[in-house]
Amino acid sequence: PLQTPSITIANNAASIASGSNGESVYTATYTMQSSDNTGVIPFSVDFKDLANNEGVQIIAVINDVDGGVTFDKQAPSFTSVTISSDNSNNTALAIVNDEITLELTSDEAIITGTDPTITINGNNASVTRNSTTSFTATYTMSSPSDDGIDGSVIPINISAYSDATGNVGTTLTATTDGSFVTYDKTLPTLPTVTISSDNTYDHLAASGDELTLTIASDENIN
Protein backbone atom coordinates (compact mmCIF):
# COMPACT_ATOMS: atom_id res chain seq x y z
CA PRO A 1 0.00 0.00 0.00
CA LEU A 2 1.03 3.58 -0.64
CA GLN A 3 0.54 6.94 0.89
CA THR A 4 -1.55 9.25 -1.28
CA PRO A 5 0.84 10.19 -4.09
CA SER A 6 1.69 13.70 -5.26
CA ILE A 7 0.70 14.02 -8.91
CA THR A 8 1.08 16.82 -11.42
CA ILE A 9 -0.44 17.03 -14.90
CA ALA A 10 0.72 19.76 -17.28
CA ASN A 11 2.92 20.99 -14.42
CA ASN A 12 -0.15 21.66 -12.28
CA ALA A 13 -1.26 19.83 -9.17
CA ALA A 14 -3.83 17.20 -10.04
CA SER A 15 -6.86 16.24 -7.99
CA ILE A 16 -6.81 12.74 -6.54
CA ALA A 17 -10.23 11.49 -7.54
CA SER A 18 -10.04 8.19 -5.72
CA GLY A 19 -7.72 6.33 -3.37
CA SER A 20 -6.49 7.08 0.12
CA ASN A 21 -3.73 5.94 2.45
CA GLY A 22 -3.53 2.19 2.46
CA GLU A 23 -5.07 1.74 -0.99
CA SER A 24 -3.11 0.83 -4.11
CA VAL A 25 -5.22 2.31 -6.94
CA TYR A 26 -5.44 6.07 -7.53
CA THR A 27 -7.00 8.30 -10.16
CA ALA A 28 -5.75 11.83 -10.74
CA THR A 29 -7.51 14.45 -12.85
CA TYR A 30 -6.73 17.91 -14.17
CA THR A 31 -8.73 20.14 -16.50
CA MET A 32 -6.60 21.71 -19.22
CA GLN A 33 -6.57 25.51 -19.33
CA SER A 34 -5.99 27.91 -22.21
CA SER A 35 -2.81 29.06 -20.46
CA ASP A 36 -1.29 25.56 -20.55
CA ASN A 37 1.42 24.79 -23.09
CA THR A 38 0.58 22.94 -26.27
CA GLY A 39 2.23 19.65 -27.12
CA VAL A 40 2.62 16.36 -25.26
CA ILE A 41 1.20 16.86 -21.77
CA PRO A 42 3.79 16.14 -19.06
CA PHE A 43 2.91 14.46 -15.81
CA SER A 44 4.76 13.34 -12.73
CA VAL A 45 3.99 10.97 -9.87
CA ASP A 46 5.86 11.07 -6.57
CA PHE A 47 4.95 8.35 -4.10
CA LYS A 48 5.93 6.66 -0.83
CA ASP A 49 4.89 3.50 0.91
CA LEU A 50 3.44 3.47 4.39
CA ALA A 51 6.94 3.06 5.83
CA ASN A 52 7.87 6.34 4.09
CA ASN A 53 10.16 4.69 1.55
CA GLU A 54 10.22 6.95 -1.49
CA GLY A 55 9.63 5.32 -4.88
CA VAL A 56 11.30 6.34 -8.14
CA GLN A 57 9.45 9.30 -9.63
CA ILE A 58 7.35 8.50 -12.68
CA ILE A 59 7.27 11.11 -15.42
CA ALA A 60 5.71 11.41 -18.87
CA VAL A 61 5.80 10.10 -21.41
CA ILE A 62 8.19 7.18 -21.38
CA ASN A 63 6.19 5.54 -18.61
CA ASP A 64 2.85 6.06 -20.32
CA VAL A 65 1.84 2.80 -21.98
CA ASP A 66 -0.80 4.66 -24.01
CA GLY A 67 1.78 6.89 -25.68
CA GLY A 68 0.78 10.14 -24.02
CA VAL A 69 -1.80 12.85 -24.66
CA THR A 70 -1.17 15.89 -26.83
CA PHE A 71 -2.73 19.24 -25.92
CA ASP A 72 -3.95 21.26 -28.91
CA LYS A 73 -5.56 24.61 -28.22
CA GLN A 74 -4.95 26.12 -31.65
CA ALA A 75 -8.09 26.50 -33.73
CA PRO A 76 -7.80 25.68 -37.44
CA SER A 77 -7.87 28.47 -39.97
CA PHE A 78 -8.06 28.82 -43.71
CA THR A 79 -4.81 30.33 -44.92
CA SER A 80 -6.03 30.58 -48.50
CA VAL A 81 -9.54 31.57 -49.59
CA THR A 82 -10.16 32.67 -53.18
CA ILE A 83 -13.34 33.35 -55.13
CA SER A 84 -14.03 33.41 -58.86
CA SER A 85 -16.85 33.20 -61.38
CA ASP A 86 -17.08 31.11 -64.54
CA ASN A 87 -18.24 34.21 -66.42
CA SER A 88 -16.81 33.98 -69.93
CA ASN A 89 -15.69 37.62 -70.02
CA ASN A 90 -14.48 38.37 -66.51
CA THR A 91 -14.02 35.99 -63.55
CA ALA A 92 -14.62 38.90 -61.17
CA LEU A 93 -18.14 39.39 -62.53
CA ALA A 94 -21.21 37.17 -62.52
CA ILE A 95 -24.60 37.17 -64.16
CA VAL A 96 -27.61 34.88 -63.72
CA ASN A 97 -26.59 31.21 -64.14
CA ASP A 98 -22.88 31.88 -63.61
CA GLU A 99 -21.25 29.52 -61.12
CA ILE A 100 -19.31 31.00 -58.21
CA THR A 101 -16.40 28.96 -56.88
CA LEU A 102 -14.58 29.26 -53.57
CA GLU A 103 -11.24 27.46 -53.14
CA LEU A 104 -10.10 26.96 -49.53
CA THR A 105 -6.90 25.63 -47.96
CA SER A 106 -6.57 25.15 -44.19
CA ASP A 107 -3.44 25.16 -42.03
CA GLU A 108 -4.31 21.77 -40.52
CA ALA A 109 -6.60 18.83 -41.11
CA ILE A 110 -10.32 19.50 -40.79
CA ILE A 111 -11.97 16.52 -39.17
CA THR A 112 -14.30 14.45 -41.33
CA GLY A 113 -17.90 15.26 -40.51
CA THR A 114 -17.13 18.92 -39.78
CA ASP A 115 -16.63 20.18 -43.31
CA PRO A 116 -17.12 23.95 -43.30
CA THR A 117 -20.60 25.35 -43.75
CA ILE A 118 -20.31 27.82 -46.60
CA THR A 119 -22.85 30.30 -47.91
CA ILE A 120 -22.53 32.45 -51.02
CA ASN A 121 -24.90 35.41 -50.93
CA GLY A 122 -26.64 33.71 -48.02
CA ASN A 123 -27.34 30.53 -49.99
CA ASN A 124 -25.88 27.17 -49.00
CA ALA A 125 -23.03 26.26 -51.31
CA SER A 126 -22.16 22.74 -52.42
CA VAL A 127 -18.95 21.82 -50.57
CA THR A 128 -16.50 19.23 -51.89
CA ARG A 129 -13.70 17.82 -49.71
CA ASN A 130 -10.61 17.49 -51.91
CA SER A 131 -8.38 16.45 -49.00
CA THR A 132 -8.24 16.98 -45.24
CA THR A 133 -6.99 20.54 -45.87
CA SER A 134 -8.56 21.45 -49.20
CA PHE A 135 -12.18 22.26 -50.05
CA THR A 136 -14.13 23.62 -53.00
CA ALA A 137 -17.52 25.33 -52.67
CA THR A 138 -19.79 26.22 -55.58
CA TYR A 139 -23.07 28.05 -56.04
CA THR A 140 -24.93 29.09 -59.19
CA MET A 141 -26.42 32.59 -59.18
CA SER A 142 -30.14 32.71 -59.90
CA SER A 143 -33.05 35.08 -60.24
CA PRO A 144 -35.03 36.21 -58.35
CA SER A 145 -33.31 34.78 -55.24
CA ASP A 146 -30.12 36.78 -55.81
CA ASP A 147 -31.66 39.95 -57.24
CA GLY A 148 -31.17 41.87 -54.01
CA ILE A 149 -27.43 42.30 -54.50
CA ASP A 150 -27.49 43.44 -58.12
CA GLY A 151 -24.42 45.59 -58.64
CA SER A 152 -22.82 44.52 -55.36
CA VAL A 153 -19.95 42.27 -54.31
CA ILE A 154 -21.23 38.76 -53.57
CA PRO A 155 -20.90 38.07 -49.80
CA ILE A 156 -19.47 34.81 -48.44
CA ASN A 157 -19.55 33.11 -45.06
CA ILE A 158 -17.39 30.17 -43.92
CA SER A 159 -18.11 28.62 -40.51
CA ALA A 160 -18.65 25.48 -38.39
CA TYR A 161 -15.37 23.69 -39.07
CA SER A 162 -13.05 22.09 -36.53
CA ASP A 163 -9.85 20.08 -36.17
CA ALA A 164 -9.43 16.58 -34.77
CA THR A 165 -9.20 17.92 -31.22
CA GLY A 166 -12.50 19.77 -31.55
CA ASN A 167 -11.13 23.30 -31.78
CA VAL A 168 -13.64 25.34 -33.79
CA GLY A 169 -12.32 27.71 -36.44
CA THR A 170 -13.23 31.39 -36.71
CA THR A 171 -16.02 32.42 -39.06
CA LEU A 172 -14.64 34.02 -42.23
CA THR A 173 -16.42 36.54 -44.44
CA ALA A 174 -13.61 37.59 -46.78
CA THR A 175 -11.05 36.08 -49.11
CA THR A 176 -7.36 36.01 -48.20
CA ASP A 177 -6.11 37.41 -51.49
CA GLY A 178 -8.59 40.25 -51.91
CA SER A 179 -10.46 38.51 -54.72
CA PHE A 180 -14.17 39.22 -55.12
CA VAL A 181 -17.03 38.74 -57.56
CA THR A 182 -19.59 41.42 -58.38
CA TYR A 183 -23.09 40.31 -59.37
CA ASP A 184 -24.66 42.13 -62.33
CA LYS A 185 -28.06 40.98 -63.54
CA THR A 186 -29.11 44.27 -65.12
CA LEU A 187 -29.08 44.19 -68.90
CA PRO A 188 -27.23 47.07 -70.56
CA THR A 189 -29.27 49.65 -72.45
CA LEU A 190 -28.53 52.26 -75.08
CA PRO A 191 -30.42 55.32 -73.86
CA THR A 192 -28.95 57.50 -76.59
CA VAL A 193 -28.81 56.47 -80.25
CA THR A 194 -28.52 59.18 -82.93
CA ILE A 195 -27.75 59.16 -86.63
CA SER A 196 -26.60 62.08 -88.76
CA SER A 197 -25.18 62.86 -92.18
CA ASP A 198 -22.27 65.09 -93.14
CA ASN A 199 -24.60 66.68 -95.65
CA THR A 200 -25.20 70.40 -95.22
CA TYR A 201 -28.51 69.27 -93.88
CA ASP A 202 -27.51 66.57 -91.40
CA HIS A 203 -30.91 64.94 -91.60
CA LEU A 204 -30.47 64.35 -95.32
CA ALA A 205 -27.96 62.27 -97.24
CA ALA A 206 -26.95 62.21 -100.89
CA SER A 207 -24.72 59.75 -102.69
CA GLY A 208 -21.23 60.03 -101.22
CA ASP A 209 -22.37 61.51 -97.91
CA GLU A 210 -21.04 59.84 -94.77
CA LEU A 211 -23.47 58.72 -92.13
CA THR A 212 -22.52 58.69 -88.46
CA LEU A 213 -24.32 56.62 -85.84
CA THR A 214 -23.65 57.75 -82.26
CA ILE A 215 -24.47 55.36 -79.44
CA ALA A 216 -24.22 55.98 -75.70
CA SER A 217 -24.69 53.12 -73.23
CA ASP A 218 -25.63 53.21 -69.57
CA GLU A 219 -22.58 51.07 -68.62
CA ASN A 220 -19.33 49.80 -70.06
CA ILE A 221 -19.90 47.53 -73.05
CA ASN A 222 -17.61 44.60 -73.75
Regions found by a protein language model. Give the residues of each.
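Non-catalytic beta-sheet/beta-sandwich ligand-binding modules that flank or precede catalytic cores
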Residues: 1-222
